[in-house]
Amino acid sequence: MATEDDDSFRILVATDTHLGYAEKHPERGNDSFQSFEEVLELAVEHNVDFILLGGDLFHENKPSRYCQVRCMDLLRKYTFGDRPVHFNILSDPAVNFPHTKQVNFLDPNLNVAIPVFSIHGNHDDPAGMGLLCALEMLSSAGLINYFGRVSDLNDIKISPVLMEKGNTKLALYGLSSIKDERLHRLFVENKVKMLRPKESLTEWFNLMTVHQNHAKRGPSNYLPESFLDPFLDLVIWGHEHDCIKEPRHSHQNFHVLQPGSSVATSLTPGEAEEKCAFLLQVNSHHQFKVDPLPLKTVRPFLFEEVFLSEYNIEDEVKRIKKTELTKEESTWELLMKAKALGEAKGKGRGRGRGSKASDAASQAQIKDNPVELFVEHRVRELLKGAKKLLTGHPR
């Protein structure tokens, strides 16, 4: 984008926050909430007009009460206040937000400073009686504006949220998560239609957010970019956890931004990429600019593949023993001692000599196993690398 003007939309974009992931873990239980709070802090810091979330706000379809309360408290803390909202909604709220029939910042009973717009993902999709999802609870409480839900899975019509800020017109399309094979079939059968404003088509910046497989994981187990309408300008692609910092130009002539997740939920190379939120700016000249905002509260995560066939393990172990294992006890020895201590406390006098002998044999086996020693050394090196990634953030 060439220049920012007073009419420019400033949007904080994030996807896949997975609130509640590993919430019972003694070490990692707070990770998802810390990163989500940082996303909200960035929205306040960068004085955005609204926050756009691309699905999987929650990790579980039925988030715990603890998780729901943490989420609601954070949203109230950072998105409510006396700051005025500087854009208008031109479309029919009853169509865009069928559950509440209105956008939250126009509710006279609420003081919303930074509106949040969100679609649902595959983790927090509607289910159970009434086919409701956790986002509808947040919507009923006036904390978010839940949009992009499909009411008829045999004939999908996507109606945009039409926004105006000065001379800038923004059409926001949302498509919440649908099973990839089903959505693929509906597109093939021409049963997905994206509605457009009736007037001044060229004046609108067309922004869409989806939550589907981006990478091809089978003949129909993904959403091809070619299925989306070419009149779009930018697509925010949720569901994929790899963070791709630069918008990519597709063959359909629109750009695609894949923000990735804000917390690692699986042991894959993509989760080891630096995690970011994004500041999206759209001006009155139909231009946009995307700035990655690296998240500083994310727990460092390193991923490495080791092919033992590429190493002479015996030589590697000799080198390791000379340089590292002669200086301090190995991690495995410490783990075995901790295990033995825990069992001794648990069983007390009930332990016999046979058990102690078994522990000693296990320690000796681990210490003398060259593969174990080699892998342990690689883990030590990864931990050293992870320490260098710490940002010094107070959380």
What are these model-predicted stretches?
Residues 9, 89-92, 309-395:
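Non-catalytic terminal accessory segments
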Residues 39-59:
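Active-site metal-binding motif and surrounding structural segment of the metallo-beta-lactamase
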Residues 15, 37-40, 44, 72, ...:
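Amphipathic alpha-helical interaction motifs in eukaryotic regulatory proteins
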Residues 1-8, 35-45, 162-163:
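Short amphipathic alpha-helices and their capping/turn segments at secondary-structure boundaries
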Residues 10-16:
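Short, hydrophobic/glycine-enriched beta-strand segments
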Residues 2, 50, 62-266, 271-274, ...:
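His/Asp/Glu-rich metal-coordinating catalytic cores
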Residues 19-34:
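Acidic/histidine-rich helix-loop elements
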